[in-house]
Each structure stands twice: as structure tokens, then as C-alpha cells.
From Swiss-Prot:
Sections of the chain in a coiled coil: none
Protein name as catalogued: Bacilliredoxin BH1716
Lineage: Bacteria, Bacillati, Bacillota, Bacilli, Bacillales
Pfam families cross-referenced by the UniProt entry: Disulph_isomer
GO biological process: cell redox homeostasis
InterPro entries attached to this UniProt entry: BrxB/BrxA
Residue ranges crossing the lipid bilayer per the database entry: none
Amino acid sequence: MSMHYEDYMRQVVEPMRRELTERGFKELLTPEEVEQYMESAEGTTLVVINSVCGCAAGLARPAAVTSLAHDKHPDHLVTVFAGQEKEATAKMREYLAPNPPSSPSMALFKGKELVHFIPREEIEGAEPEALIRRLAMAYNEHCE
């Protein structure tokens, strides 16, 4: 790929990154960062597989952020960006097995155990409030 294209894509996705990072999500940019985080994870973690698609912009990111206002919420927030940090995303997807690759998607972990997963096909066409409720129910069940 040309350097011009890569620079352009970095500029395009920056606001999409900030939508999560400015609200407390830590970006995991390399496979090593993903592995280091996941292998030492304690408590609960919400993972957002970010994406440039419309359902990420209109549904997944806003639902993830809004869900954090719930009384119970995850201890930690992390994100990887599909299509941007491909190796980091591939590494995170290993922890999401047996679920097939899906972006955007949201996952709740308790320690290293995947306890709740929302794939793209359940995000597309959903009402934002329904996604927020679904996350809140998972938080009620798994978060302190």
C-alpha cells in the first residue's frame, strides 16, 4: 500500500479511535500488548473490536460508551481496531474463539474467560437502546 493511502486512513480513523479512547478505553496496538493484557487480566473487561463501518459509528461505539453509565460496569476497557492494527486484532480474536471474526463486536471478559459476546450481525439493525440494555444485563450478571 502507498504511504499516502496509509496516512489518509490514519487521519480518517482518528476520530473513530478517540470516540473510545477519550472515554477511558485503552488501545491495544500490537499482538504483544493484547497478549500481555489478556494474560494478566483481572476483574471484568469490556473489549470493543472497533471498525470503520456504519454500524460501528452509529451503534457499537455509542452503545459501548453509553452502557458505562450503568450502576455496574466493567473494571477495564480495551479496544483493538479491525483493519488498522490487523495483527493485534487477530490476536484478540484468538481470545474470542470459538466465535468467528466479527467487526465491530463487543465482548465481556471475567479474567480471561469470555462471558458475553455481541457479534456484528447482532449489532447491525439493532436499536442502540437494545444494545445498551444487553450490555447492562451482562454487567449485572458479571460485574461488581
